[in-house]
């Protein structure tokens, strides 16, 4: 997988975002502001490697994605993350991207994370509490729930944006059902070989699907299979 800078060259959150801008990955002010506000270092155990452009293990056979992948997904969803919009983050892990989403949609919007490992949900809430997204958690526009992300989170559907942080063999119907007409879903699809797919829902309920790039994610699976390392 492509790495955009060496491990030793970046050791600050702002410098990480500037590098993403210099490489043309972050192209909008809104995404840059959100990533600058939400310090990635708060969401990883090894802060010395927090800003390296590489995925990092977070336990339970899963990883936090590399910064350039988070930035790419934020850019792909940017027009669907305006203030007041609703966003669902499936496989929310450390809570980092959920926090970025919350900053972008603001207090009038809603950012929902779904993660099926209870321990990760608990630690992600602590991470968010220590971040710039803490006010959104306190007043209720940001929440993280224990659940099977393949089923989405119907309580606050439909969503303007849905992000999936693990690879599904095919796009779960529940996520398409919970996507608002005019909304966008970004999801890695495939088994060994995966594509990051952009799914746009049309006004008549049909969907248009585009392959954005080849990727490698951990599988979107059951909690039991994940803990076994299947």
UniProtKB/Swiss-Prot annotation:
One of its GO terms (cellular component) is cytoplasm. It catalyses: [protein]-L-isoaspartate + S-adenosyl-L-methionine = [protein]-L-isoaspartate alpha-methyl ester + S-adenosyl-L-homocysteine. GO terms for molecular function: protein-L-isoaspartate (D-aspartate) O-methyltransferase activity. Coiled coil: none annotated. It comes from Arabidopsis thaliana. This is Protein-L-isoaspartate O-methyltransferase 1. Keywords: Cytoplasm, Methyltransferase, S-adenosyl-L-methionine, Transferase. PANTHER family: PROTEIN-L-ISOASPARTATE O-METHYLTRANSFERASE (PTHR11579), PROTEIN-L-ISOASPARTATE O-METHYLTRANSFERASE 1 (PTHR11579:SF28). Seeds over-expressing PIMT1 have reduced accumulation of L-isoaspartyl residues in seed proteins and increased seed longevity and germination vigor. Conversely, reduced PIMT1 expression is associated with an increase in the accumulation of L-isoaspartyl residues in proteins, leading to increased sensitivity to aging treatments and loss of seed vigor under stressful germination conditions. Belongs to the methyltransferase superfamily. L-isoaspartyl/D-aspartyl protein methyltransferase family. SUPFAM superfamilies: S-adenosyl-L-methionine-dependent methyltransferases. Catalyzes the methyl esterification of L-isoaspartyl residues in peptides and proteins that result from spontaneous decomposition of normal L-aspartyl and L-asparaginyl residues. It plays a role in the repair and/or degradation of damaged proteins. Contributes to seed longevity and germination vigor by limiting the abnormal accumulation of the L-isoaspartyl residues in seed proteins.
């Amino acid at each position: 997988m492509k790495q955009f800078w060496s491990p030793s060259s970046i050791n600050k959150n702002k410098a990480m975002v500037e590098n993403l801008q210099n490489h043309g990955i972050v192209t909008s002010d809104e995404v840059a502001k959100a990533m600058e506000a939400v310090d990635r270092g708060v969401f990883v155990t090894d802060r010395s490697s927090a800003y390296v452009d590489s995925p990092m293990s977070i336990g339970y056979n899963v990883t936090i994605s590399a910064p350039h992948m988070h930035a790419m997904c934020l850019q792909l969803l940017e027009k669907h993350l305006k203030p007041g919009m609703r966003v669902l983050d499936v496989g929310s892990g450390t809570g980092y991207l959920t926090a970025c989403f919350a900053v972008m949609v603001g207090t009038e919007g809603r950012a929902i994370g779904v993660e099926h490992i209870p321990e990760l949900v608990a630690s992600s809430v602590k991470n968010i509490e220590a971040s710039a997204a803490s006010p959104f958690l306190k007043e209720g526009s940001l929440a993280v729930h224990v659940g099977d992300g393949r089923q989405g989170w119907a309580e606050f559907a439909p969503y303007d944006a849905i992000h999936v942080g693990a690879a599904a063999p095919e796009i779960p119907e529940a996520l398409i059902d919970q996507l608002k007409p005019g909304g966008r879903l970004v999801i890695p699809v495939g088994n060994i070989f995966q594509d990051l797919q952009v799914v746009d829902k049309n006004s008549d309920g049909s969907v248009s699907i585009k392959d954005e790039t080849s990727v490698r994610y951990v599988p979107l699976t059951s909690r039991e299979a994940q803990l076994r390392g299947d």
